[in-house]
Amino acid sequence: MIRILHFSDLHLGTEAYGRIDPATGLSSRLADFLAAFDQVVDYALDNRVDLVLFCGDAYRSRDPGQTYQREFACRIKRLSAGKIPVFLLAGNHDLPNAVGRATSVEIFHTLEVENVTVANRPQSYRIETRKGLVQIIALPWLRRSALLSREDSKNLSFDEINQKLEDMLTQWLNSEIESLDPGLPAILAGHLSHSGAMPGSEKTMMVGRDYILLQGNIANPAFDYVALGHIHNTQTVDSPVPIVYPGSLQTIDFGDEGKEKGFYLVEIEESGDRGGEAAIL
C-alpha cells in the first residue's frame, strides 16, 4: 500500500487581513501560512508517507520575495532530507509574467535537489518510492500562448480559444493514458478546473476565464487517483475514480470563511483498490 500526501494552493505571500510586523516588515499572515505548511511537513515525516504531491501555487505572487522563497525551500528541504519524494506541480501563480523566464519552483530542478521532481510542462513521470514506482501524468497550468500560436488563435473569440486549448489537452491526456503500465499505480496530477468543480476564492485571484476540462475526460479508470489544485474549496467528486481538490491550506479571503482547510492522505493498493483519509488542519 502506497501512502500519498496531497496538498495544493499554499499561496505564501498572501497578506490580506493581516498586519505588518514593524520589526521584520513582514505580514502577520506569513506565520499563519507557515504554521499550516509545517503541519503538512511534520505529518509527512512523522507518518513516513511514501510521496508528497503538491498540485500548484506555492506563492501568491508570480515574483515572490526572497523571504517567501527561503521559507518554502526550507520546508521542501526537510522532506528531501527525510528521503520522502516530493512532486511539485506548477500552478498559474508559479508562472512568470514573461514567456522564457523561470517558474518560481524551477530552482529545485536546476539545483537537482534530491528526491524533488518539478513538473513545469505536461509530461508523464515514474517516481520511485519506498513501496515501488508510481506513475504520474502531470498537467501543470499552461498559458494559452504555450500551446497556441498567434496564427492558431487568429480571429478566434476568447471562448473559441479556450475550447481549442481544452481539445488539445484532452487529446494529449488520452494519448498519455494509453502508455500507462496497468501493473503500476497511476495518478493524474493537475492544476486546473474541471466541469464538476465548485469554484472558491481563487476566482478573486484570476483574470479572465479558466479553460475547463470535462470531468469525464479526467475520471479515467486507468487512474487510481486524480490529484488536483487551483480550486480553493476542499472537495471530492463522486466518480469511479477519486477526484480531489484539497483546497487552499489557509484562508485566502472572506470567501473561504468557515470552510475546512487541510490536506489529504491517500492510500493506494497495488491491486487498484483505494481508500482515503482526510486530515483537516
What are these regions (language model features)?
Residues 1-75:
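N-terminal active-site segment of His-dependent metallophosphoesterases
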Residues 7-8, 51-57, 85-92, 117-120, ...:
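Active-site neighborhood of phospho(di)ester-bond hydrolases with catalytic His/Asp-centered motifs
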Residues 10-11, 49-67, 84-99, 192-211:
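Active-site neighborhood of divalent metal-dependent phosphoester/pyrophosphate hydrolases
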Residues 56-75, 90-113, 128, 200, ...:
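Metal-dependent catalytic neighborhoods of phosphoester/phosphodiester hydrolases
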Residues 71-83, 215-222:
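Catalytic-core regions built around general acid/base machinery
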Residues 106-211, 249, 269:
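Conserved catalytic scaffold of divalent metal-dependent phosphoesterases
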Residues 179, 268-281:
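A short C-terminal boundary segment appended to hydrolase-like catalytic domains
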Residues 194-272:
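Conserved beta-sheet core of the metallophosphoesterase superfamily
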